[in-house]
């Protein structure tokens, strides 16, 4: 429509059917223009054609009012093709004064021709012409419309309406009449609102409102279930309509983002347009508008947006922006509790991406991500559980501080349950989470004390499902259960001769020399390198070899090929020599070669790009089973570590990248930064920081880095390659602190195998040059050169080892380091001719030292020869019989740690014995030159386990009161722990040792506590063991009861009245205790006990007796005469009762103290099975103790109150004589009155002890103590002098003492 007038024309358009061009001026009448257009249409459109019309009609009525017959009427009519689509366009260059809407509306009211559809199907009330009622598509784009014609809403079959590129500010509310509308496009207009009536268009499939001025559009999509496309791009939206009801939505555009996905939401394409900011305008991130829009409401819970977020977070910059938005983080967390499984899965993927950053991970913990996580972990849907577990796995890995916050009692319980899930992938993810949590040292201490978790992992490691047993083995490796892991994967045991260690120096391309020496060792031994050594380590190029040989199990030929690739790809010249910068670089290189290295390092920077080197390392270290160092520990490979230098701390520290975890209890130095008053310090995880405290702490290190990262960090030689950085940590070449890592290898061996000696130590250098006169140069630069040479020298370590190791003749030390001028090549040398010279020098070195290579090969193959001899000797012995028990053959013996620690309890009733086995042990060790340390646990008065409590008054108000048993069957006390107070031997004590009168009440301990503080006796033991690393045997001269080993004792008063149920049960407890101890002569015990029918008989027979481990001393008696003349006697006893125990939980928390040590018990009763298992689970070699376990004293059920009031009337209290002389006379008189039936009974055998004037001990079986003393001495003689295995030593010692019953408990194989 132009402003000039011309005759109308009609042409056939293949896309639009027929196109009609009509020009008119603004002054023309709209009616005239409409008539002209209508006439043009009549001419242009095809002529009418014959159409058969079929019409069905009812004929006649039946009795019920229905139609009886149907009539068929057929006729032929002239009709035109129905009108389907109309497009109104404004020609380019037309005037802007008129939009032609009036012409269109008049044209729509006209009825140009008969309708093509039956008249009843059309709304007769419509003002639209009949022919227009068949229109399904109408386009009014680019017409300059200011208002949408209302007549358009009268088209009943309209499905597509296009109104793009107009000037519409609003849409008419009548648009809701278009019930069949499927596509509505109103892009590039000026809309500021959308009519509410649009929600009546329930059939919409596409709604496009791009590039308008919508701020808060009121769009109600609840009835538009079929909407698939929603475009709101380019609108200044402040509020996103609720799109959750749009389940079919697959295309979405918002602000500056366009989103298109496939039907299943598996593939999502996201396009983000950046804003064009001016030079002076502040730049905004591309997500600055999108992020607050979708995270302001719950719309992000839509599946399409959830998938979009995953796509967006693949970009590191996008993750950073979203991670800083707390509201966005909280919305993502809320998405994991969605009812839509796809949303949960995508939210977990997004959160996992975010959690890789430490700062965002801390933000997630601050937003309480663990609460919904624990909720979803209880879901019945395995897919949802797997998705959430992936978040847990990522969070636990990213940071120790985050991991420590994650491990709660509920989380641990949930993970244990999921480890036993029926779905293998759920099991695998749960095991990965447990393993990642164990990277944190504090978490590892907690997890290792979980007995059920340990047993579960041991069970899962042998499951037939490969992915489950690999994950279980990984968890055991991270927990530091190296021995359990070795036995589970049937790994090779450390030879009996001792450890075999290989260390390799740094040297860049000179590592070719190391490879050549290793080839000679491999040739002479006939075994691959990884089978010859238990520990392999290296620095820089030596570290790369250590990884290649020990972790990747490569051949030496493959290692040689790696060096050639290294020279070709990494160290090749990349800058043309005629280039000016290259020329400048060469000049600086020449300056370096003239001994000005320090200047070179400062000015020149890195010579080679690390990108190609990293690519080569990633290709070499790729592993489908996991790329972490610790994940190689499950493959039955040697222990391997690589030395680097952590330069992001001051001073720089050695850093050990290792493929193993230290056993729990090993003092470690954490390299995690902690902020204190604006400064950064390193946190120490060592057991104590006291002055003078012995610390054999491990170096800083990690087993959670990727394998290629370890090599890259160790090889970051200054000038040659850039430093290697991960997060805030930065590493340089390990040669700065340990170019010869042999000292580090010895330290790591001591930490891994504390009771195993080193048999063979092989150190290989990369070649050195002879000492020569230094050429003159710049004075200060020469000083820097000297300092660098000294720091990287390998000879200082060699000199120290050559001096010290001869003092340890059992260690065979071999050092291979050729000294030749041909070994002086550059670290990045790429000239093959110089490589050949180096190889020639090494070959000459090998030929000149044949005997040394022969000796080292013989020493390394000695374990293999011993294994073959053992098998040969085994065959004839068991050819016709059963095979030997593997448990016996693997029985441990005393290692190189040969000191003894003797521990005795404070106030022990055994300390007063005339003959005591502890004194005999001290004499034996003194006479045989065995270093013995003693520990007497001390407990301050009122010593309690550290926990706050509330005081309550004691029930005892006077020492002259009758006793009763509280009705509570179980009460937790701070000193005795959980005690059954209805047991006769566990009455709450009235302390006579100066303790507090009031007790403190504490809650039962939670499991597991975050920080466990051992109380005084246990702290003393733990510190003593940490200070004495050479202790190989821990002798616990402690009594045992059902709660554990008794560390200290205290005195109290106990009162019992007779006659009464309490007295009967007390007397029964005494008899049962005596019978349990006198098992070897029950007939004598029965004859003695037959004469004791009451407490009166008991105290007449003995003033002092023992119930279990508790000593009772008779003090006195009070007689009370009741109104019916019945006498009630109240007997008062002084008891020596346990006040502190070494419980299984305590043993597990002190796990590092027992590792590789032999535990010996020598009390009356042996330890309980729980105590033994705790020791063995904590790494003890063996536990030896009496076979008879402490038995529970029969329980007493109080019927009502057992207390009896003491009155002054009719009461006479008799205090028993405590003077020594009177006691002797009194005992002699009582023996005359009541003579035991058998003179040789155990009662009489111990009578002489009761007359001891010291009055310290009233034991009953002194003869047994003398035999125990002899037995202990014989046991130690077998262990130390004969070097017998533990079980064999015990058998030989028991052979001479048939009465004693002792058992040796060994770890399960």
Curated annotation (Swiss-Prot):
The nitrogen atoms of the two glycine residues in the GGXR motif define the oxyanion hole, and stabilize the oxyanion that forms during the nucleophilic attack by the catalytic serine during substrate cleavage. Residues 1183-1253 are annotated as: Disordered. ARM repeats lie at residues 315-356, 401-439, 440-481. It comes from Arabidopsis thaliana. It comes from the Eukaryota. It holds the Pfam family Arm. SMART domains: ARM (SM00185), LRR_TYP (SM00369). A motif (DGA/G) lies at residues 733-735. PANTHER family: CALCIUM-INDEPENDENT PHOSPHOLIPASE A2-GAMMA (PTHR24185:SF1). Belongs to the patatin family. It is an enzyme of class 3 (hydrolase). A motif (GXGXXG) lies at residues 506-511. This is Phospholipase A I. GO terms for cellular component: chloroplast; membrane. It is found in: Plastid, Chloroplast. Its main location: plastid. Gene3D superfamilies: Cytosolic phospholipase A2 catalytic domain, Leucine-rich Repeat Variant, Ribonuclease Inhibitor. Keywords: Chloroplast, Hydrolase, Leucine-rich repeat, Lipid degradation, Lipid metabolism, Plant defense, Plastid, Repeat. Signal peptide: none annotated.
């Amino acid at each position: 429509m132009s402003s000039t007038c011309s005759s109308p024309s009609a042409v056939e358009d293949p896309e639009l059917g027929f196109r009609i061009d009509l020009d008119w001026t603004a002054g023309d009448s709209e009616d005239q223009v409409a008539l002209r257009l209508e006439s043009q249409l009549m001419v242009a459109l095809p002529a009418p054609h014959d159409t058969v019309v079929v019409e069905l009609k009812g004929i006649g009525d039946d009795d019920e009012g229905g139609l009886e017959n149907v009539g068929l009427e057929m006729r032929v009519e002239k009709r035109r093709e129905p009108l389907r689509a109309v497009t109104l366009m404004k020609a380019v260059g037309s005037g802007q004064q008129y939009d032609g809407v009036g012409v269109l509306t008049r044209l729509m009211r006209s009825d140009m021709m008969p309708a093509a559809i039956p008249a009843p199907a059309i709304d007769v009330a419509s003002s639209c012409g009949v022919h227009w009622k068949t229109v399904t598509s109408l386009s009014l784009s680019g017409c300059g419309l200011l208002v949408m014609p209302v007549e358009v809403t009268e088209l009943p079959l309209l499905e597509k309406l296009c109104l793009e590129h107009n000037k519409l500010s609003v849409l008419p509310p009548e648009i809701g009449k278009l019930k069949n509308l499927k596509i509505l496009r109103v892009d590039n207009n000026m809309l500021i609102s959308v009519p509410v009536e649009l929600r009546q268009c329930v059939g919409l499939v596409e709604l496009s409102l791009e590039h308008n001025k919508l701020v808060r559009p009121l769009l109600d999509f609840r009835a538009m279930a079929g909407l698939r496309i929603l475009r709101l791009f380019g609108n200044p939206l402040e509020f996103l309509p609720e799109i959750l009801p749009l389940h079919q939505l697959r295309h979405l555009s918002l602000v500056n983002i366009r989103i298109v996905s496939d039907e299943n939401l598996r593939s999502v394409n996201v396009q983000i347009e950046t804003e064009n900011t001016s030079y002076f305008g502040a730049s905004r991130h591309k997500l600055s508008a999108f992020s607050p829009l979708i995270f302001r409401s719950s719309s992000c819970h839509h599946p399409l947006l959830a998938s979009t977020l995953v796509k967006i977070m693949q970009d590191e910059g996008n993750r950073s922006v979203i991670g800083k938005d707390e509201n966005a983080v909280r919305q993502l967390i809320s998405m994991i509790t969605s009812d839509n499984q796809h949303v949960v899965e995508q939210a977990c993927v997004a959160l996992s991406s975010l959690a890789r950053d430490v700062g965002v991970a801390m933000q997630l913990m601050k937003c309480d991500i663990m609460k919904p996580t624990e909720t979803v972990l209880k879901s019945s849907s395995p897919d949802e559980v797997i998705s959430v577990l992936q978040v847990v796995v990522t969070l636990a890995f990213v940071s120790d501080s985050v991991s420590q916050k994650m491990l709660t009692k509920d989380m641990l319980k949930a993970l244990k349950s999921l480890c036993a899930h029926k779905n293998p992938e759920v099991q695998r993810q749960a095991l990965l989470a447990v393993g990642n949590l164990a990277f944190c040292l504090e978490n590892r201490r907690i997890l290792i004390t979980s007995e059920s978790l340990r047993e579960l992992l041991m069970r899962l490691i042998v499951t037939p499902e490969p992915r489950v047993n690999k994950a279980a083995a990984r968890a055991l490796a991270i927990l530091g259960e190296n021995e359990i892991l070795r036995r589970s994967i049937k790994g090779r045991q450390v030879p009996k001769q001792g450890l075999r260690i290989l260390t390799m120096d740094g040297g860049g391309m000179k590592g070719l020399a190391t490879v050549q020496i290793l080839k000679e060792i491999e040739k002479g031994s006939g075994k691959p390198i990884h089978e010859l050594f238990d520990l392999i380590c290296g620095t820089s190029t030596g570290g790369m070899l250590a990884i290649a040989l020990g972790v990747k199990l490569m051949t030496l030929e493959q290692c040689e090929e790696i060096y050639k690739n290294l020279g070709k790809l990494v160290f090749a010249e990349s800058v043309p020599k005629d280039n000016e910068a290259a020329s400048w670089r060469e000049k600086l290189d020449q300056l370096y070669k003239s001994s000005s290295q320090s200047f070179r390092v400062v000015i020149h920077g890195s010579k080679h790009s690390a990108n190609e080197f990293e690519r080569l390392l990633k290709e070499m270290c790729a592993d489908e089973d996991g790329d972490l160092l610790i994940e190689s520990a499950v493959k039955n490979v040697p222990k391997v570590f690589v030395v680097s230098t952590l330069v992001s701390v001051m001073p720089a520290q050695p850093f050990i990248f290792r493929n193993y975890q230290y056993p729990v209890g090993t003092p470690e130095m954490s390299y995690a930064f902690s902020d204190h008053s604006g400064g950064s310090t390193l946190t120490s995880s060592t057991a104590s920081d006291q002055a003078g405290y012995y610390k054999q702490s491990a170096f800083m290190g990690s087993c959670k880095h990727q394998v290629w990262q370890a090599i890259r960090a160790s090889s970051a030689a200054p000038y040659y390659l850039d430093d290697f950085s991960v997060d805030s940590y930065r590493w340089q070449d390990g040669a700065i602190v340990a170019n010869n890592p042999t000292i580090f290898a010895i330290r790591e061996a001591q930490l891994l195998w504390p009771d195993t000696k080193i048999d063979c130590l092989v150190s290989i250098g990369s070649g050195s040059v002879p000492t020569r006169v230094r050429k003159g140069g710049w004075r200060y630069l020469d000083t820097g050169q000297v300092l660098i040479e000294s720091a990287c020298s390998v000879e200082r370590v060699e000199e120290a080892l050559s001096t010290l190791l001869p003092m340890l003749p059992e260690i065979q030390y071999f050092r291979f380091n050729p000294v030749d001028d041909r070994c002086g090549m550059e670290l990045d040398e790429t000239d093959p001719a110089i490589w050949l010279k180096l190889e020639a020098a090494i070959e000459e070195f090998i030929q000149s030292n044949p005997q040394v290579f022969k000796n080292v090969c013989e020493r390394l193959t000695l374990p293999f020869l011993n294994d073959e001899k053992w098998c040969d000797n085994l065959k004839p012995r068991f050819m016709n019989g059963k095979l030997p028990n593997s448990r016996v053959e693997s029985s441990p013996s005393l290692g190189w740690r040969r000191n003894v620690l003797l521990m005795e309890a404070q106030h022990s009733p055994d300390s007063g014995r005339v003959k005591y086995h502890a004194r005999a042990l001290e004499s034996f060790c003194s006479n045989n030159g065995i270093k013995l340390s003693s520990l007497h646990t001390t407990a301050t008065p009122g010593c309690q386990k550290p926990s706050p409590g509330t005081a309550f008054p004691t029930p005892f108000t006077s020492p002259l009161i009758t006793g009763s048993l509280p009705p509570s069957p179980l009460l937790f006390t701070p000193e005795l722990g959980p005690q059954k107070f209805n047991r006769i031997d566990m009455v709450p004590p009235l302390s006579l040792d100066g303790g507090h009168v009031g007790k403190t009440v504490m809650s039962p301990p939670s499991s597991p506590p975050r920080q466990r503080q051992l109380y005084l006796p246990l702290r003393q033991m733990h510190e003593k063991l940490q200070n004495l690393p050479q202790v190989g045997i821990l002798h616990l001269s402690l009594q045992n009861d059902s709660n554990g080993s008794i560390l200290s004792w205290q005195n109290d008063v106990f009162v019992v009245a007779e006659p009464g149920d309490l007295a009967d049960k007390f007397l029964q407890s005494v008899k049962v205790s005596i019978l349990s101890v006198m098992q070897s002569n029950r007939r004598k015990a029965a004859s003695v006990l037959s004469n004791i029918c009451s407490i009166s008989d008991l105290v007449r027979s003995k003033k002092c007796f023992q119930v279990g481990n508790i000593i009772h001393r008779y003090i006195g008696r009070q007689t009370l005469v009741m109104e019916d003349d019945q006498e009630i006697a109240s007997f008062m006893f002084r008891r020596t009762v346990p006040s502190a125990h070494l419980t299984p939980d305590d043993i597990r928390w002190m796990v590092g103290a027992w590792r590789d040590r032999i535990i010996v018990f020598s009390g009356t009763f042996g330890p309980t099975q729980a105590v033994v298992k705790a020791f063995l689970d904590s790494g003890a070699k063996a536990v030896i103790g009496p076979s008879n376990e402490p038995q529970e004293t029969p329980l007493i059920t109080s019927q009502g109150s057992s207390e009896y009031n003491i009155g002054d009337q009719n009461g006479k209290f008799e205090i028993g004589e405590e003077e020594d002389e009177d006691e002797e006379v009194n005992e002699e008189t009582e023996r005359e009155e009541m003579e035991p039936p058998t003179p040789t009974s155990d009662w009489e055998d111990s009578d002489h002890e009761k007359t001891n004037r010291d009055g310290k001990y009233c034991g009953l079986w002194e003869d047994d103590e003398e035999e125990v003393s002899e037995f202990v001495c014989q046991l130690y003689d077998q262990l130390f002098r004969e070097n017998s295995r533990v079980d064999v030593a015990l058998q030989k010692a028991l052979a001479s003492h048939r009465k004693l019953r002792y058992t040796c408990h060994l770890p399960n194989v």
